[in-house]
């Protein structure tokens, strides 16, 4: 287990909260609130999800994965926490969403099994929870087909992101449990771009995800000071 690109403490945090994953008033409320934004952003840039084979890396309980399946994609969600995966399977069964599967497997291992098998790969709100983000990016590049799309999201590392993503979200607004994020694992856009280039992906777009605590509204804008999303493609034939 020590050789895997996994932080066991990170896995344990989300395992402990697994039963609340689909409760829109729980600690996962922010994920439910941002999901329509990120789903539409991915859908538009991928040229539509319907009929495509999609992999969601670090899927947790399946909020994004299931919503992509509802758009008509054939989805595999992978995670290293078994409890969230069990919640995802149960929810899909209850909602009769049949075009989705879940597996407990490291993305690097799946890349050895299924290289070039996916039209779209998503890895959202996960990069800042692993020891080696570059390894995740490379595995995603391996898994996507030539011409396919890979999407990432994470949190910038700077004083503003510390103030907003940790002090604000975890301590002041209490949107997230204390200890959800480790500032030192946040990833600057320049670092993300470096890993993307090294993996052989082409960076197409970065956009910021913003939140107003007064209006409780989320929106997308060019500023990537705190939360941001990335669209890449795998060029070649």
UniProtKB/Swiss-Prot annotation:
Pathway: Cofactor biosynthesis; ubiquinone biosynthesis. Its EC number is 2.1.1.222, 2.1.1.64. The keyword S-adenosyl-L-methionine applies. GO terms for molecular function: 2-polyprenyl-6-hydroxyphenol methylase activity; 3-demethylubiquinol 3-O-methyltransferase activity; polyprenyldihydroxybenzoate methyltransferase activity. S-adenosyl-L-methionine binds at residues 38, 58, 79, 124. One of its GO terms (biological process) is methylation. The keyword Heme does not apply. InterPro entries: SAM-dependent_MTases_sf (IPR029063), UbiG_MeTrfase (IPR010233). It catalyses: a 3-demethylubiquinol + S-adenosyl-L-methionine = a ubiquinol + S-adenosyl-L-homocysteine + H(+); a 3-(all-trans-polyprenyl)benzene-1,2-diol + S-adenosyl-L-methionine = a 2-methoxy-6-(all-trans-polyprenyl)phenol + S-adenosyl-L-homocysteine + H(+). Keywords: Methyltransferase, S-adenosyl-L-methionine, Transferase, Ubiquinone biosynthesis. O-methyltransferase that catalyzes the 2 O-methylation steps in the ubiquinone biosynthetic pathway. Belongs to the methyltransferase superfamily. UbiG/COQ3 family. This is Ubiquinone biosynthesis O-methyltransferase.
């Amino acid at each position: 287990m020590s050789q895997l690109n996994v932080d066991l403490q990170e896995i344990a945090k989300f395992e402990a909260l697994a039963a609340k994953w689909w409760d829109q008033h729980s600690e996962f409320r922010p994920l439910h609130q941002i999901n329509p934004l990120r789903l539409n952003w991915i859908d538009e840039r991928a040229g539509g999800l319907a009929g495509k084979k999609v992999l969601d890396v670090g899927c947790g309980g399946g909020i994004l994965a299931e919503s992509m399946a509802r758009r008509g994609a054939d989805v595999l969600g992978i995670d290293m926490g078994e409890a969230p995966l069990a919640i995802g399977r149960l929810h899909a069964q209850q909602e009769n969403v049949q075009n989705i599967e879940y597996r407990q497997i490291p993305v690097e291992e799946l890349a050895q099994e299924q290289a070039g098998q996916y039209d779209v790969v998503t890895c959202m709100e996960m990069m800042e929870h692993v020891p080696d983000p570059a390894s995740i990016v490379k595995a995603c590049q391996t898994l996507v087909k030539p011409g396919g799309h890979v999407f990432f999201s994470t949190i910038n590392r700077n004083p503003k992101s510390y103030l907003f993503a940790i002090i604000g979200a975890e301590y002041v607004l209490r949107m997230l449990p204390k200890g959800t994020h480790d500032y030192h694992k946040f990833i600057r856009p320049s670092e993300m771009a470096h890993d993307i280039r090294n993996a052989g992906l082409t960076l197409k777009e970065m956009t910021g995800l913003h939140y107003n605590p007064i209006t409780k509204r989320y929106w997308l804008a060019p500023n990537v000071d705190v939360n941001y999303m990335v669209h890449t493609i795998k060029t070649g034939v």
